[in-house]
Amino acid sequence: MSRMTAVRTPAPSDRPRLGLRERKKIKTREAIRTATYGLIEEQGYEATTVEQIADRAEVSASTVFRYFPAKEDIVLTDEYDALLVEDLRSRPADEPWLESLRHAMRRAVGLGMGEEQEVTRLRCRLMAEVPAVRSRMLENMSETGRAIGEAIGERTGRDPESLEVRVFTMSLVGGLMEVSQYWARTGFRDDLSDLVDRALTVFARGLTS
């Protein structure tokens, strides 16, 4: 694997400029993530400690934990969930729901592969190979599903906490997690956007030929 480049937080150009305090927080967060990915690349996930991450990022260990409650969160946390939900809410009201979802997912994947391709692959590989990372991802799925469910509720007029919406969103999030692991286990040979499209087609049509 080539040396990791610095992790960048995607920021739409139409958003107002952040204040100095917020920019410093983002810079610290990115420094911690970049340090983590670099250390994992060099010595592996299990050998990488929070103390080493803090030292390389030039912050204290307590600062690392203030931004990320656990080491697994450093690997898993990104800004694409929020962008995905934002995209879903901005799609035309008369557009079929799955088409809106397909569009938003393509954009999220495109941003991840365009700006953080190495990081995206490493994250997926760790989810497939490291039980602690995979377990933490499962814990985080409910929060992601709830955010998507709220967007679905706005579009459909359904209660986001209804059984039907929860089943749909958690099935979707679980399916996308499986896409990530499948991609890693097959050596990243397929285009990730194509795999996401295939998964969404299963949601639309079921296991039909």
Task: Describe these PLM feature segments.
Residues 82, 118-146, 158:
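Short secondary-structure transition hinges
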Residues 1-12, 188-209:
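C-terminal peripheral helix-coil segments that are non-catalytic and often amphipathic
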Residues 138, 154-200:
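Hydrophobic/aromatic-rich alpha-helical bundle segments in the mid-to-C-terminal region
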Residues 32, 70-75:
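Short amphipathic alpha-helical segment with a characteristic S/N-K-E followed by hydrophobic residues
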Residues 55, 69-70:
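Residue-level detection of the helix-turn-helix DNA-binding "recognition helix"
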Residues 86-123:
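Hydrophobic alpha-helical connector segments
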Residues 62-69:
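Base-recognition residues in the alpha-helical recognition helix of bacterial helix-turn-helix
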Residues 2-43, 47-62, 83:
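Basic, helix-initiating cap at the start of DNA-binding domains
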